[in-house]
């Protein structure tokens, strides 16, 4: 409510400027986000931008697209070239955000210039320099999505431990259903991270070794698990030559029984589908049951760039940032709209488990691409050993000093 009142007051203060801008054609603000494609908040995002345009007389040139490696790479290239947008919805407090920090404005600096705004400085998003740059919008978790109705139809056990996972893979493979939808060539990080969950204890998941000799044995075993799953027929035959959209379509069309993915995948499900979907913790490779940790965090938020801050578009950009991050709009953009069995299983996934950050978030872009796009596919195919994988990764000093 406080933010909503401030936004109304701030907009009122700028009405004369907006009116003048409208008369002169207004200013044009460039925005980039991943509110596009099947994202459930895509429509709400467009509505927010349209409302801002109608109220301000300004124009928003939005370049949103589905979040993938190509999307991230394009954004980082824009920042490197000095052609970044005015407002950006992007990853925060991880390796992805480090390259953009010199060209975005801290929330403390914005709040100092606009004291009534009081953008929330969430400690979870505090960067290594001690500053917070992003207004948080979306938290996330990752898990093993399953079509429970397919499990019932084919008499396959839900993966409550490693043996039941392997049995489910066998049953679905024999019945012409892809057991686990994945793209090894495009987005293999869910598989890599979940393999670590299957093998590593909490302290090992949080380890940041400096040399290959310090790499936990469980990390090596996790890579072996990827090869084990491949040999068991867990993935489609073309998993190494397909993209994320194609592999996800297999799951959405129920041609695949399971998919390792994040909470954002739920935006592609209808309420009816959520009644027969569940998200489960990763089974342990050794021992009983499932992992006592899950992957999660606050993943993304809105940034204001210095390009906008140091231009005549500053007030207009701050007003748009305020509108995008109002309490009401954060709910609209951050709401995953979970219902039914999927909702209850997501709550169970997190209850009583420790949240850990994905390992890739601690790596820089070069190391992450080496691990995920070079090593993981090769390990799955059997052309690289787990030892060779981690030697290659550790040679790049993945976690810094």
Annotated model-derived regions:
Residues 8-9, 18-96, 286-289, 388, ...:
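Conserved N-terminal structural module of periplasmic/extracytoplasmic solute-binding proteins
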Residues 30-33, 50, 54-55, 59-62, ...:
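Extracytoplasmic/periplasmic substrate-recognition and gating elements
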Residues 77-78, 86, 114-149, 178-182, ...:
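A structural signal for short loop-to-beta-strand junctions that line the ligand-binding cleft
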Residues 90-143, 157, 166, 191-193, ...:
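Hinge/lid segment of periplasmic solute-binding proteins
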Residues 108-120, 200-223, 271-272, 284-293:
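Short, solvent-exposed loop/beta-turn-alpha elements that line the ligand-binding surface or hinge
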Residues 127, 296, 334-401:
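C-terminal capping/gating helix-and-loop segments adjacent to ligand/active sites or protein-protein/ligand interfaces
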Residues 133-135, 142, 166-212, 227:
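Extracytoplasmic/periplasmic solute-binding protein
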Residues 169-171, 209-240:
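Glycine-centered hinge/linker elements that transmit conformational signals in sensory
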């Amino acid at each position: 409510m406080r933010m909503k009142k401030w936004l109304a007051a701030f907009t009122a203060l700028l009405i004369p400027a907006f009116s003048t801008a409208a008369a002169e054609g207004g200013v044009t603000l460039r925005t980039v986000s991943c509110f596009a494609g099947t994202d459930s908040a895509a429509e709400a995002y467009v509505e927010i931008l349209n409302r801002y345009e109608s109220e301000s007389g300004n124009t928003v040139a939005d370049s949103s697209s589905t979040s993938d490696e190509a999307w991230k790479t394009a954004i980082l290239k824009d920042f490197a070239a000095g052609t970044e947008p005015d407002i950006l919805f992007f990853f925060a407090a991880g390796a992805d955000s480090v390259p953009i920090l010199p060209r975005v404005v801290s929330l403390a600096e914005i709040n100092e210039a606009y004291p009534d705004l009081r953008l929330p400085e969430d400690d979870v998003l505090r960067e290594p320099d001690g500053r917070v740059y992003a207004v948080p919008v979306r938290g996330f978790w990752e898990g093993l999505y399953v079509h429970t109705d397919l499990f019932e139809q084919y008499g396959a056990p839900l993966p409550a431990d490693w043996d039941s996972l392997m049995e489910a893979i066998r049953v679905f493979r024999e019945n012409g259903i892809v057991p686990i939808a994945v793209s090894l060539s495009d987005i293999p990080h869910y598989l890599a991270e979940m393999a670590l969950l299957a093998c590593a204890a909490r302290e090992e998941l949080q380890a940041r070794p400096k040399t290959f000799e310090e790499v936990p044995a469980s990390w090596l075993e996790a890579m072996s698990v990827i090869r084990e799953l491949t040999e068991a027929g867990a993935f489609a035959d073309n998993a190494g030559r397909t993209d994320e959209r194609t592999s996800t379509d297999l799951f959405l069309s129920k041609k695949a029984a399971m998919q390792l993915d994040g909470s954002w995948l739920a935006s592609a499900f209808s309420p009816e589908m959520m009644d027969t979907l569940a998200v489960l913790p990763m089974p342990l490779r050794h021992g009983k049951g499932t992992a006592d940790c899950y992957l999660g965090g606050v993943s993304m938020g809105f940034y204001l760039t210095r390009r906008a801050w140091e231009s005549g578009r500053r007030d207009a950009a701050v007003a748009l940032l305020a509108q995008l991050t109002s309490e009401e709009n954060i709910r609209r953009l951050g709401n995953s709209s979970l219902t039914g069995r999927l909702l209850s299983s997501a709550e169970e996934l997190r209850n009583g488990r420790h949240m850990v950050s994905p390992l890739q978030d601690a790596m820089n872009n070069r190391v992450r691409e080496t691990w995920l796009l070079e090593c993981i596919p090769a390990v799955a195919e059997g052309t690289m050993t787990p030892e060779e994988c981690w030697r290659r990764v550790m040679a790049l000093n993945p976690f810094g000093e």
